[in-house]
Regions:
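Active-site-proximal loop/hinge segments that shape catalytic or ion-binding/gating pockets
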Residues: 121
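C-terminal helical cap/extension that packs against the catalytic core
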Residues: 15-16, 57-115
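Nucleotide phosphate-binding/pyrophosphate-handling subdomain across enzymes
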Residues: 1-66
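Short, active-site-adjacent cap segments at secondary-structure transitions
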Residues: 124-126
């Protein structure tokens, strides 16, 4: 959980959590964590091209308030947010697109009393921590 810094200011009073999970088994662990929260959870997700995007995201269907897709900054091996959106369009999510990490966090900070969970790639989490 990020409790201070630039990104926490953007998140406002909402909790901001990062998790480097990027495979199917980690998605089950994250989904279980989400089930145990007493607040709505908004996901911010970016992944590498070689991952099982649909299976990873399927774990969160029916559990999250929304999913915001972004590109992994400074990483050529990531799937584009638009291609990612196409790959998971058959899943039941309220999908959003953002051009940046801080933009995605800001977009989700408008939902009161929620948790913003950034996940899907260790590269993404590294960029999040660098921003903060």
């Amino acid at each position: 959980e990020i409790k201070s810094g630039k990104l926490k200011k953007i998140a406002g009073n909402n909790r901001l959590v990062v998790d480097g999970g990027h495979n199917i088994s980690s998605s089950y662990v994250i989904a279980n964590w989400i089930k145990n929260q007493n607040q709505k959870v908004n996901l911010v997700v970016a992944m590498m091209k070689d991952k099982e995007h649909q299976k990873f995201m399927k774990s969160f269907e029916g559990l999250v308030n929304s999913v915001t897709l972004i590109d992994i900054p400074n990483q050529d091996g990531g799937i584009s947010k638009n291609e990612f959106k196409e790959k998971i369009s058959n899943l039941n999510f309220k999908l959003k697109i953002s051009d940046s990490i801080d933009g995605a966090i800001h977009l989700n900070s408008k939902d009161i009393n929620t948790i913003t969970l950034v996940t899907g790639s260790l590269y993404l989490i590294g960029e999040v921590l660098n921003l903060n």
